[in-house]
Amino acid sequence: MINVKILSYKSPQRYAVKRTLIGAKNELLKTHPDFEIAITEVKELSEIEKITRVVILPSLVVNEKLVCVGRFPHKYEVIGWLREALQLQPGSITVRQGK
């Protein structure tokens, strides 16, 4: 399982990033039916500031690695970060990229 954190104290921003994450997850499920992610929304400024100084715009953490700061990621960027996280897991799934 991949753990993902959405960092933003503004609910509409978290919602937009969560929709992108779910779209990326659904795309990966087509080729990896056992793929799972756990999404946590970090809302408290004090918790966000432990990870990044950028608090006005959303940020994204994948398996405790800060991958996106202060912007809304594109679905295909998120797919790339999730694929990378899959490959780094013990007993990971082999990910093949299409042509």
Identify the function of each model-found stretch:
Residues 47-51:
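Acidic pyrophosphate-coordinating catalytic loop
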Residues 62-91:
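Non-catalytic, surface beta->alpha helical segment in thiol-disulfide oxidoreductase systems
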Residues 4-6, 37-39, 78, 82:
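Hydrophobic beta-strand residues in large extracellular and virion-surface proteins
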Residues 52-61:
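Structural micro-motif
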Residues 89-99:
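Short acidic DE-rich linear segments
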Residues 1-30:
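Local sequence-structure signature of Cys/Sec-based thiol-disulfide redox active-site neighborhoods
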